[in-house]
Amino acid sequence: MQIEIKDGRSDNSPLPERKLVTLIQESYDSLKDDNEINLSTESTSNLLIKLVLEKLEKHSSLYKYIASVTTLNIEGLNEENANFSLKNDIGASWESKKDGIFNYKLEDKNSNECYLITILWLHK
């Protein structure tokens, strides 16, 4: 078994990278626009994961999907006061020709939050 360490692998994605970005952004926008969801009590990251996974499953049932969201509160951070550090590593055992990973950073300036989104797909 060959083990590879890479920053990301989206060239074999079930969707083009641009479509993945659009899917994530549309999912987030629909959360913000839904007046029935109280984002002060509901977990934005959990709702975002649910919407993204539902949309991915509609595109292809040939894959299993995993979505992860890391939420950063960036309120009060500026160029003089940017004293936080975040490191997230993930590993998987997969077939590199069929499986892959995509990372995306989504910022919401209105809520002072930043979402680091990771999507993995594993061919069934």
UniProtKB/Swiss-Prot annotation:
This is Topoisomerase I damage affected protein 2. Its main location: cytoplasm. It is found in: Cytoplasm; Cell projection. It comes from the Eukaryota. GO terms for cellular component: cell projection; cytoplasm. It comes from Saccharomyces cerevisiae (strain AWRI796) (Baker's yeast). Belongs to the TDA2 family. CDD domains: DLC-like_TDA2 (cd21457). Coiled coil: none annotated. InterPro entries: Tctex-1-like_sf (IPR038586). Keywords: Cell projection, Cytoplasm.
